[in-house]
Amino acid sequence: MSKTLLQENETMAVARYVRMGPNKVRRVLRQITGKSYSEALLLLEFLPYKSCDPIIKVLRSAVANAKNNLGYDTTKLVIKKAFADQGPVMKRFRPRAQGRAYRILKPTSHITIVVGS
């Protein structure tokens, strides 16, 4: 998503190559879309998912971008869009019995959060 696709009152932050499957990240992003910054941060602090940590980092970065670059008040910011795209998949091999090898897939994802007033 380029800056030209953003509305005038929106800003974004992206974390790329996060070592987590995109479906596991989307499960949390669906819950915070449309919520205010403080409400989403409170929700992310107490959700029991591992994907909350990188999402909190991206959310704080998006809010810092809005505050520093555009001068917005952080109390009025709302999460407009939040999505996770699939990144490259790292392929590893696990040795098994009798000379066999099983393929292990380690997915990555790109997390994007758009905030606006």
Curated annotation (Swiss-Prot):
It is found in: Plastid, Chloroplast. It comes from the Eukaryota. Keywords: Chloroplast, Plastid, Ribonucleoprotein, Ribosomal protein, RNA-binding, rRNA-binding. GO terms for molecular function: rRNA binding; structural constituent of ribosome. Pfam families: Ribosomal_L22. InterPro entries: Ribosomal_uL22, Ribosomal_uL22_bac/chlpt-type, Ribosomal_uL22_bac/org-type, Ribosomal_uL22_CS, Ribosomal_uL22_sf. One of its GO terms (cellular component) is chloroplast. GO terms for biological process: translation. The keyword Nucleus does not apply. Its main location: plastid. Part of the 50S ribosomal subunit. This protein binds specifically to 23S rRNA. Belongs to the universal ribosomal protein uL22 family. HAMAP family: Ribosomal_uL22_B. This is Large ribosomal subunit protein uL22c. It comes from Emiliania huxleyi (Coccolithophore). The lineage of its organism: Eukaryota, Haptista, Haptophyta, Prymnesiophyceae, Isochrysidales. The gene is rpl22.
